């Protein structure tokens, strides 16, 4: 996988703006619901399952147009750590309690006994599909890609498949 989800996150937001009636404040700051999520799953390096990861993420409650601000941190069993900040775009069904999210984040990677990702600056982008249980929370399946976007000579990246539970604050 490459930066496809990063591009989709931006394009989905721009498409949302183009079909909504938001002018002249399409990128205005807004308050949105805050959420905390915790997820766990498998880490893949060049299609091989190499590790397990736990990931904690917070949606801050601040949005600029269709993009919601988010930050998070993850740790693997092999003592690799990542922490970053970015944006997510969410689409929710009006007729069923289902949703999809795309996210794009930049952050710092500290290598333990895990894979060499080329350097400390790493970008994380991905997609999540889930079910919204209302006031009791949400359950989703996520897939994301982490790499340095070619700023270092080594740029193989990691993929993560996780089960995520989130709840509102």
Q: What is each residue range found by the language model?
A:
Residues 42-53, 73-85, 113-114, 118-120, ...:
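Solvent-exposed loop/turn segments connecting transmembrane beta-strands
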Residues 36, 62-69, 95-99, 135-141:
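Repeated loop/turn-to-beta-strand initiation elements of outer-membrane beta-barrel proteins
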Residues 156-169:
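Outer-membrane beta-barrel "beta-signal"
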Residues 58-62, 89-93, 131, 145, ...:
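Residue-level signature of outer-membrane beta-barrel architecture
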Residues 1-31:
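Cleavable N-terminal export/targeting peptides
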Residues 74-105:
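Mid-length scaffold segments of soluble, non-membrane domains
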């Amino acid at each position: 996988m490459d930066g496809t989800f990063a591009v989709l996150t931006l394009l989905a937001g721009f498409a949302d703006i183009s079909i909504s009636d938001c002018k002249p404040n399409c990128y205005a700051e807004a308050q949105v619901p805050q959420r905390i999520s915790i997820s766990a799953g498998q880490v893949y390096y060049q299609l091989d399952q190499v590790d397990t990861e736990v990931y904690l993420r917070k949606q801050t409650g601040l949005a600029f147009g269709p993009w919601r601000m988010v930050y998070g941190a993850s740790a693997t069993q092999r003592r690799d750590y990542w922490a970053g900040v970015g944006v997510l775009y969410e689409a929710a069904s009006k007729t069923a309690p289902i949703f999809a999210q795309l996210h794009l984040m930049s952050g710092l990677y500290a290598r333990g006994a895990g894979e060499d990702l080329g350097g400390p600056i790493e970008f994380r982008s991905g997609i999540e599909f889930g079910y919204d249980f209302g006031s009791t929370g949400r359950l989703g399946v996520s897939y994301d890609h982490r790499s340095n976007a070619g700023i270092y000579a080594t740029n193989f990246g990691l993929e993560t498949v996780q089960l995520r539970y989130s709840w509102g604050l």
